[in-house]
Amino acid sequence: LIGQNPGLLIDNCASGGRRLDIEMMKRSVPLWRSDYYVSGNVTDSDSARSIGYNLSYWLPLSCGGSTTDGLGTSYDFRCAMGSGMTVDIPVSDFGWWSRRVDEYFRIRELMSGDYYILSQGNVTNYTKKNACYEYIDPESGEGCLILFRPEGSLAEKQTFYLKGLDPDAVYTLRVSDNGEEITASGKALSDDGLTVSMNQPRMSLVIFFSEK
C-alpha cells in the first residue's frame, strides 16, 4: 500500500493496541494505542496512565482516547496525556480547560526529547505507588516532571532524582499548579534529588524546569 501510495498514513488501530510491534510501527501510526481510555472511572485513568507511561520508552508517539466527563480533574487530564490526545472541551468552566490544554501543548513540545521514568514499581503497582516521569530537551535544557499520587498510595512525600541535567548548570523549577519556584544546580537535582509533597490521594503535579 505504501509503495503504491507514497506518503500514505496508516492508522494502527487493531486489537486494542496488541499489534504495537516493530514491523507494524515501521509502517503505521498508533492513533489509538489501547481500548483503555480516560472515562472518569478511577481504574481507567490509572490504567491509561500506566500504558502511556511505560509505552513511551519504546513508542514515544501515540494517541489515546478520553471523554469529557473523564477529564474533569487535573489528575485525570494528565493521565490521558500523550503526544496525541483527544479533548472535547465543554462550554462550562472554559478557563480551567484552557489552562489544561495550554499546559499540555507546552509538555507535548518536550515529548520528542529524552524520556526518563524516575519512579520504580509502576508496571504492576501503578494504583498504589507514586509515579514520576521526566521529559527533557537535551539541546535547550528545558524539561518537565509529571507526578501522580494514585488513590492507593500512602506516600505524601517522595524524592526523585532527575536525569539528563548539566551538573554545572543552575535550573529554575516552576510548579505549574501554583506557580511556586525554586532554583537548584543540576548536580544537586541529580545527586540529592527533588523532594515533592502531594498531600492527598489522586493528586498530580507538573513541574517545568529550564537552565538559568
Which residues fall in each region the model found?
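C-terminal beta-strand-rich structural cap/linker in extracellular carbohydrate-active enzymes
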Residues: 184-212
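Active-site-proximal substrate-binding groove within the catalytic cores of carbohydrate-active enzymes
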Residues: 1-182, 198, 205
